[in-house]
Amino acid sequence: MLNADLKQQLKQLLELMEGNVEFVASLGSDEKSKELKELLTEISDMSPRLSLSEKSLKRTPSFSVNRPGEETGVTFAGIPLGHEFNSLVLAILQVSGRAPKEKQSIIDQIKNLEGSFHFETFISLTCQKCPDVVQALNLMSVINPNITHSMIDGAVFREESENIMAVPAVFLNGEEFGNGRMTIQDILSKLGSTADASEFENKEPYDVLIVGGGPASGSAAIYTARKGLRTGIVADRIGGQVNDTAGIENFITVKETTGSEFSSNLAAHIDQYDIDAMTGIRATDIEKTDEAIKVTLENGAVLESKTVIIATGAGWRKLNIPGEEQLINKGVAFCPHCDGPLFENKDVAVIGGGNSGVEAAIDLAGIVNHVTLFEFASELKADNVLQDRLRSLSNVDIKTNAKTTEVVGEDHVTGIRYEDMSTGEEHLLNLDGIFVQIGLLPNTSWLKDAVELNERGEIVIDRNNNTNVPGIFAAGDVTDQKNKQIIISMGAGANAALNAFDYIIRN
């Protein structure tokens, strides 16, 4: 089931195993069970440290990744290919005894959790957010014997996942725990275990502290580190919103990549420099004093720096119409690549006629029964090549001059109301899902009145990426720069870094 290149890469990774690992598989006579057995046999044959046995488990087909004679609590229900293949490889290495690449403070938090935690995560193999959650919970299961985790492919276990309309969907001890991307720190926080503020108390002041972890942040950090400045990053995750991007084909010199691969490469590049990257933590306040610029973190710790570059990016913009908020993850979705497979053979709408909306409609048309694309303006704003592709599809309708007014449904989406602005008539369209693609909302709510914002909530900057507060710079999608592109954000991050350096030597 694995191509030659992947088998060669896997063989090299399996050489890093430090102990024996046993696949314990629950298999039936169905086609998926045959595929799973083929995959596990193929992998087992690649290392003498791997073995395969069979046993009845809660779900079929599924398998656990165990040490000989010891259950680790790590289970995959379905066939972990696609984006989840890396989750399987990591699980093998970690169960074998390979040390995880996590801070000791995080490992200690996991070890100290008290109680029994049985996690189940519903995923789709096309979901780019899902592996982060699966890998975090697998690691927690390996570290703490009171934790178990099962990854469940919703496409294989359709009855169980029938009412799940957004992935990853995490359940703890049978109750809903969370939806969407979560870091290991997010999970620990939801369990009541937070990073100790004392970890940050003895940090020396920075020359440049960058808040955010996306392309602008990474670019800024590398530029300031290369200038010899003491540089820190405070971020939820390296890569930011790019992690949720499927394909990237307009980053010059890189013909094609994915958001996950881009973010991984960005993290690796940052690691090559003396940069203090503090991930899994968010800033909640910023204040300039006579002595320094102070950034307060969500755990109460305060970091000081001569300059700060704000690069917190942006998140999905919502419709802000009745019914939307209460039906998010219950039919209202924002990521077609993650959640699209959950709407197979169903009717959906895409809101937004820009590149993102049209690309989403094109992708969904290959999965769902029918797509209706709504655009508020009189014509679509997407590139012509995308519009031509969209109009060639037989299961897509396009409605322009359409103002969406209500998401309809009780416990899940059943329809959408919209107004035809050319006639003033209101309509109800019955459907099962709504994908909102109307742009981004800057992540500036934490700033309060610290720097000047425009009417859209974006940070106002000048050509040198200065804000209205000396020493505080901003770059990327969080600012009022007109065009929001990865390559533009990286240039803006570099520009902010060079001007922060200039500010330091002049002050």
Curated annotation (Swiss-Prot):
PROSITE patterns per UniProt: GLUTAREDOXIN_2, PYRIDINE_REDOX_2
CDD domains to which the protein is assigned, alphabetical: AhpF_NTD_C, AhpF_NTD_N
Cofactor: FAD
Binding sites annotated in the UniProt record for NAD(+): 347-361
GO molecular function: flavin adenine dinucleotide binding; NAD binding; NADH-dependent peroxiredoxin activity; oxidoreductase activity, acting on a sulfur group of donors, NAD(P) as acceptor
Cofactor binding notes: Binds 1 FAD per subunit.
Cystine connections: C335-C338
Pfam families linked to this entry: Pyr_redox_2 (PF07992), Thioredoxin_3 (PF13192)
Sorted UniProt keywords: Disulfide bond, FAD, Flavoprotein, NAD, NADP, Oxidoreductase, Redox-active center
EC annotation from Swiss-Prot or TrEMBL: 1.8.1.-
Positions contributing to FAD binding: 207-222, 467-477
Domain of life where this protein originates: Bacteria
EC top class named in words: oxidoreductase
Keyword Disulfide bond among record annotations: yes
Other remarks in the entry: The active site is a redox-active disulfide bond.
Family as reported in the entry's similarity comment: Belongs to the class-II pyridine nucleotide-disulfide oxidoreductase family.
Function description: Serves to protect the cell against DNA damage by alkyl hydroperoxides. It can use either NADH or NADPH as electron donor for direct reduction of redox dyes or of alkyl hydroperoxides when combined with the AhpC protein.
Protein name: Alkyl hydroperoxide reductase subunit F
Native organism: Staphylococcus aureus (strain Mu50 / ATCC 700699)
